[in-house]
Amino acid sequence: MARRCEVCNKGVSHGHNVSHAENKTKRTWSPNVQTVRAVVDGRVKRITVCTRCLRSGKVQRAI
């Protein structure tokens, strides 16, 4: 599953783990995306959506 929201296009962000000695190693932050059944253009479709879009009501979930 792609770690990208199909509504807001939020994806993986990159950065560093920083130790107390200021050593840096690469790491990634993944968005909290979930596969939900949603109404898209009047039809029920399975899409990948981040939880922020779910909470803000940008997606109408199918029953």
Curated annotation (Swiss-Prot):
InterPro entries linked to this entry: Bacterial_rp_bL28 (IPR050096), Ribosomal_bL28 (IPR026569), Ribosomal_bL28/bL31-like_sf (IPR034704), Ribosomal_bL28_bact-type (IPR001383), Ribosomal_bL28_sf (IPR037147)
Alphabetically ordered keywords of this record: Ribonucleoprotein, Ribosomal protein
Gene Ontology molecular function: structural constituent of ribosome
Keyword field contains Ribonucleoprotein: yes
Keyword hit for Cytoplasm: no
Gene3D superfamilies: Ribosomal protein L28/L24
One GO-annotated biological process of the protein: translation
Cellular-component GO terms for this entry: ribonucleoprotein complex; ribosome
Recorded family membership: Belongs to the bacterial ribosomal protein bL28 family.
Identification of the protein by name: Large ribosomal subunit protein bL28
